[in-house]
Amino acid sequence: FEMPYHFEIEASFLDGKEEGDFPVTPPLEGNHGPVHVAYTYHFAYEDGTPYYPVGTTCYVWELQSEELQEETLRELAKGYFNKIRFCVFPKHYIYNFHEPISYPYEGTPCDTSEMTEKNFGEYKTVDHGNHWDFYRFNPKHFQHIEDCIQKLAALGIEADIIVMHPY
């Protein structure tokens, strides 16, 4: 993985071509590299160190308030888990009625302020102010997720990221 990389992007949402370079460096001290399957039924880091995942799921911890994010990191720092699974995209569900701190796309979210635990299953809204531009990512959203991944790595915790959440 370690080498300089060059990228070129041409797309309908860009004015012209974007290109750039970035280096991939060796892991920092204490980081064993990415996790992969080893010997068919086990896991290991890139350097061969065995990895025994003991994890938890916190679907949108990184999209909650800064206070709750810090509380989550303090709890994880106690060492109970070495892996946390979470979503890249915000999610409303019975345990989460808060608006996320950011969204992955540019645009305006629908108003869910009237959603409650009691009406969650039946809540339907047609919000004509809901304007998402699914062709334009919100870079700050993903920069924040990368920052959270770095904070987890500093604690020795692997990020198990849910990209698509069909249920």
Model-derived features: positions:
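Ligand-binding face of N-terminal immunoglobulin V-set domains in extracellular IgSF glycoproteins
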Residues: 1-27
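Active-site mouth of glycoside hydrolases
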Residues: 14, 27-167
